[in-house]
Amino acid sequence: MDILRLIAVAVLGMALGTSCGLNFIHYMHMFQLNSYHADEQFKWIGKNIKDVIMRHVFTIGAILTFIICGETNASTCFIAAAFLFLGIVFSAPKKAKKKLVFTPRVMRMTVTSVILYVLLILLVFLTLGMGYASLAITMCVQILTLVMAMIANLINKPIELMINRHYINDAKRIINGLPDLTVVGLTGSYGKTSTKFYLEKLLGAKYNVLMTPESYNTTMGVVKVVRGQLNATHEIFLCEMGAKNVGEIKEICDIVKPKHGIITSIGPQHLETFKSIDNIIKTKFELADSLPDKDGIIFLNYDNEYIAKHECNKNKVTYSLGGGTDYYADNISVSENGTQFTVHNGNEEKQFTTKLIGSHNVQNIVGAIAVANTLGVPFADLVMPVKRLECVPHRLQIIKGTNKTIIDDAFNSNPTGAKAALDTLAVFDGFKILVSPGMVELGEKEYELNKRFGEQAAEICDFVIAVGERQAVPIVDGLKAKGYPEEKTYVAKNLNEALAKVENIKTGGEKKIVLLENDLPDNY
C-alpha cells in the first residue's frame, strides 16, 4: 500500500470514527431522555425523521463513492472522507437543555457498543479482504449508530437487571433497618413535586425530614436516595413517586413501604404511555393500596374529579378549595405580591399568607398543611413556615426585574397547571406575553388540549409566542378560533429565538410580564 493511499485510509478511518462517535452520543442522549425505552426511542425517531436522515445522508454518499468507483485508491478514500466530514459538520453537538449523564449504565452500553463495532468491522475485513466492498460495508456502521444503543441495552439487560436487583435489595435492607421511620409517599399527575417541597418545610418545624431531591421519582432514583442519604437520624422520609406505566408506583412502594400517602391530582399526563385515563387512576391509587390498613392514611385532593369519584377503602383525609372536605381553604385573596387564605379543619381555622401566587399553589399548600397537621404539627406552628415558602424552581417561579417580570413555569406543563399559570399571569398589571411550546405526552388528546390552551391564552395575553413549528400548530389554531390578531402571534423555531423576540416586542411603555410555560427537553 503506497503512502498516499495509507494516509487516505487513515483520514477515512478518522472521519468514520468521529462521525460514529458524535452520532452514537447523540442517540444515546435521546435514549436516556426516553428512559431507555426502545418503543419511546422509535417514536422519537419517527417524529424527527428529517434530522435522522440528514445525519446519515452524507454517509450514504461515502458508500456510493466506493460502489460507483469500484476501487480503493487514495482519491476514492479522500472523496468518501470528505462526505463523512460534511456529515460531521451537520452532526456537531448543539447546546443541550439537559446534558447526557455518563452514568455507569451508559458506560456499560458504550463498552458493549464498541465491542460490537470492532467485531463487525473485523468480520467484514476477514471475510471480504481489503477491497472497496469491505470499505463500503464498513461505512454502514455509522448508520448503525441509530440503533446501537438499543441493541447494547438489550444485550446488557440481564446484567442491568442483576445490578438493579442488588441496589433494590440494599435499599429494602436500609428501610427495614429503620423501624421508627415514617415514609410518606407523594404521587399525582401534577403538583406532587411542589407539594413535596412545601411539606418538607412544614414538617421541618417538628421533625428531621429527608425528601427525594428535585424530581427524583423513578424506582432507581428513589433507590439512589435511600442508599446514599437516608440514615437513622431521619424521622420522616418524603418519597415522590412518578410513573409512566401501570405497576411503577407499586414497585416503589414495595421498596420504601410508605405508611401514609398523598395523591395530588389525576389527569392526562403521560396518556401516551398509559393508554387510558383508567390506567392512570389505577396506577396513582397503587399508593393507597400499599398503605397499612390499620394506621395508614391516604390524603386525597377532592377538587380533582377523578380522585373524588374513585372508591377508596383506606383511611382517608380529604382536602380541597371551597369546602365539603376534612381540610379546605376559602377566602382566597390573590395579588401579584402573594396570596392570603383561610384553612379549616372541623371547628379549627387559621389564616395563612404566602408569597406564592394563585389558587393552584394554595391547593398544594392545603394538601401539605393537611398532612403536617395530621402528623402532629399544630396550625399555629404552620403559619410562619407557610409565610416563608419559596417558589419551587421552574414551577410558577416569579422572577422580578426592572423592565419585565418572568413567570417561570417551565417544568412539565399539563392542562390544569397551564390554565393555572395563565390565571397567575392575569393577576399582574402590564403587557402580558406567553412563551410556550405547548404540552406533550397527552396521547390522542394532545392536539385538542393544546388548542384549548391557545383559546385560553387568547383571553389573557397581549402577545403569544408559540415555540416549535410542529408544536405551535394547535396553539395557533386555538388563537385563531378566538379571533386573536395574527400580528400578535409569533412562531419561533426554538426558545432562544422566542426570548430574542420578547426583547423586541414594543409595549408602549408597559412593563413586560412574560410567562414561560413549559420548556420541552431535547428529545421533542
Give residue spans per PLM region:
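ATP-dependent carboxylate-amine ligase
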Residues: M1-E160, A370-A380, M384-Y524
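Membrane-proximal helical linkers
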Residues: I155-L178, T195, V222
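Walker A (P-loop) phosphate-binding motif
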Residues: A171-N217, L520
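Short beta-strand segments
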Residues: G185-T187, E240, N301, V435-P437, ...
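Membrane-embedded segments
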Residues: T218-T219, V223, N245-E251
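Switch II (G3) loop of P-loop NTPases
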Residues: H234-I249, I406-N412
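Proline-aspartate-enriched helix->loop->beta-strand connector
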Residues: K257-K259
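Acidic, Mg2+-coordinating active-site environments of NTP-dependent enzymes
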Residues: I263-T405, G430, K451, E455-F463, ...
